[in-house]
Amino acid sequence: MGKEEISTTKYLIHAQINANGIVEKPDVVGAIFGQTEGLLSNDLDLREFQKTGRIGRIKVNITSRGGKSKGEIIIPSSLDRVETAILAASLETINRVGPCEAYIQVTKVEDVRAVKRKRVVERAKEIYASMMEEVTPESLKMIEEVKEAMRVHEITEYGEEKLPAGPNVETSDAILVVEGRSDVLNLLKYGIKNAIAVEGVSVPKTVADLTRKKTVTAFVDGDRGGELILKELLQVGEIDYVTRAPKGKEVEDLEKDEIMMALRNKVPVEQFYHDLGMKKEKKKTEDKMVLLRNILKELEGTGNAEILDDALNILREVKVENLYDELSRVNNHPYAVVFDGVITQRLVDLSFEKGLRYLVAVRSGDIVKKPHNLKLITGHT
């Protein structure tokens, strides 16, 4: 086939031919045109397709032995997928070639463009590899120094304790809590900008407060130190997910694929407790929920609302109609709101902004968007 055919061909029809007699290429080509003529509509006429260049020159490789012939037929096609399939199927209706009985079977229809794409990918790999070979160790060192400088430039200090953190910790709804500065730097290296470090086994107040406002994944080392930090986090903070570096490895040493695998394999904290056979500290949470329900019973029928801290002490007591405005003005870390009224989407959104963990009311309206770390409790649930 010519250069023009190669450039426009979309598919190659491959077929196997067997004939009970000695036949040659012109016989096969003649049979293809002769026996498919009139078989289909004029729109699918093989001769017309070849005249207009929509199929290329038919290639036939055939050999004869022992009074029988066997070979391969290849037909280039620039038709669409459906037309090519119909053309391929029509070949199998041919039952004679010249004076001989014959049988044709389509073995495959090859997508030429897919083959070209594969070649492009393979060649691109080769070119890239050769480019990398030309990069000198000095150049690699220089590149790494620039990358390291950029990572250090991106790292920030967060909270009163000036904890090492990525630039997105403040604005992101979800954060990663890691052990140290090196962990944050390594995550920045791979574009993860919402990590904050505890910088030791003791969990800082800033991190504990963040766990009440955001969806938090604890990402710790796969060693004893990681276990200790995780236990402290689970006691002091409100962790949503847990993941660990592979056993014996530290987060600061992980490659990109190891980090992504660990984050994909994170588990809800409830499952973490269950999988490790650890005792989950449910009692404290369950006791709080009982107390919150009791407070709701006391408030029913009063038209009042109470804004509470994490010890369930009253920060502010207001009328329900003033609740939204009063909650907007509260800045000393409200933990829960209990009120004699109906939970609305507007109030849910504000509660999430304020970092509340519980919103308790007589009943709930139609809530379309419920934050993961805000629990809604009503008198009917």
Curated annotation (Swiss-Prot):
SUPFAM superfamilies per record: DNA primase core
Every Toprim domain range: 173-259
Protein name in UniProt: DNA primase DnaG
Record's function text: RNA polymerase that catalyzes the synthesis of short RNA molecules used as primers for DNA polymerase during DNA replication. Also part of the exosome, which is a complex involved in RNA degradation. Acts as a poly(A)-binding protein that enhances the interaction between heteromeric, adenine-rich transcripts and the exosome.
UniProt EC number: 2.7.7.101
Cofactor note: Binds two Mg(2+) per subunit.
One GO-annotated biological process of the protein: DNA replication, synthesis of primer
Subunit comment: Forms a ternary complex with MCM helicase and DNA. Component of the archaeal exosome complex.
Sequence positions that bind Mg(2+) 2: 221, 223
Amino-acid positions noted as binding Mg(2+) 1 in the UniProt annotation, renumbered to this chain: 179, 221
Reaction catalyzed: ssDNA + n NTP = ssDNA/pppN(pN)n-1 hybrid + (n-1) diphosphate
PANTHER family for the chain: DNA PRIMASE
Keywords: DNA replication, DNA-directed RNA polymerase, Exosome, Magnesium, Metal-binding, Nucleotidyltransferase, Primosome, Transcription, Transferase
One Gene Ontology term, aspect cellular component: exosome (RNase complex)
